[in-house]
Amino acid sequence: LFAMAGMLSTIPAAYFNARVLNDTALNFFETPDIRMGVLGVFLAPGLGEEFWKMAAGLLVVSCLNRRSRPVQPAECVLGFAVVGMAFAVIENIWSYGDGGAAYLLLRGLIAVPLHTSMCMLHGVGVLLYWKRRRAWPLYVFYLTTALLHGLWDVASIYGSSVREIWLPL
C-alpha cells in the first residue's frame, strides 16, 4: 500500500510542478529573475512534492489504523520511507528522457535517498501526531522537509548563482 501511495503521489505533484512551471512567472528553469526562480523551486518541488508524499503516507496509515491493528512506530517510519522510494523511482523514470544513463544514475544516487529521508521525517511527524493528538508535528515536519527539499533543489539547479540571491538582501 505504501509503495502504491508513493507512486500515485507523483501524479498530483507533477501536475502542481507543471502548473508552476508553465502558468506562472516562477518557472525556475527559464525565469530571468533568479529570485523568482528560487521562489518557484520552494513552491513547486519543495512544498508541492513534500505535501503529496506526506498526504499519501498519512492516508495509508489512517486507513490501516482504522481497518486492522494500529500501525507500529517502525512500520510507520519504514512505510513512509517506501512512499519516498516509490516516489523517487517514478520521478526518475519521468526524468530519464532528459539526460541519459549517467543522469539517471546520478538521480538514483541523490534523489532516492533525498525522497526516502524526507519521507522518513514525515513518518516521525505522523507518529508524533498520532501519539499526542496534536497537529503541530505534521506542520513542523512538513515545513522542515519542504525547506530541506527546496534548499537542495536550489543548490542543484542554480549552483554558485545562489550567491546572487543573498547578496542584495
For each feature predicted by the language model, list its residue ranges:
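Hydrophobic alpha-helical segments at protein termini of multi-pass membrane proteins
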Residues: 1-169
